[in-house]
Amino acid sequence: MRYVAAYMLATLGGNEKPSESDLKKILDSVGIEVEKDQLTKVINELKGKNLDEVIAEGEKKLASVPSGGGVAAAAPAAGGGGADPAEAKEEKKEEPEEESDDDMGFGLFD
């Protein structure tokens, strides 16, 4: 991702065809180590492509990825209601009391 970001920064800055050294300068300026193989791969993949089209294609791919929100909604239904509601009320009453600040040996404004 860092190489894609550096590539985008270079193109947004007016360099339509950034080289490895251009991207290395950008990444070095913020202290990121460069892996030459990864850098070369990103440049070769993005060479000659319109960044707006690449971003639009990426958005389409991300939209098709399940976000996990459906899993959380399905989890309560799969739990099976084996417990009696009266038992749940009794369990809530047995919660421990909150600890006071006196037990800690210091106060908030001391």
UniProtKB/Swiss-Prot annotation:
Segments of skewed composition (Basic and acidic residues): 86-95
Entry comment on modification after translation: Phosphorylated.
GO biological process: cytoplasmic translational elongation
Recorded GO CC terms: cytosolic large ribosomal subunit
Domain of life of the source: Eukaryota
Assembly information from the UniProt record: P1 and P2 exist as dimers at the large ribosomal subunit.
UniProt record similarity statement: Belongs to the eukaryotic ribosomal protein P1/P2 family.
Name of this chain's protein: Large ribosomal subunit protein P2
Organism expressing this protein natively: Cryptochiton stelleri (Giant gumboot chiton)
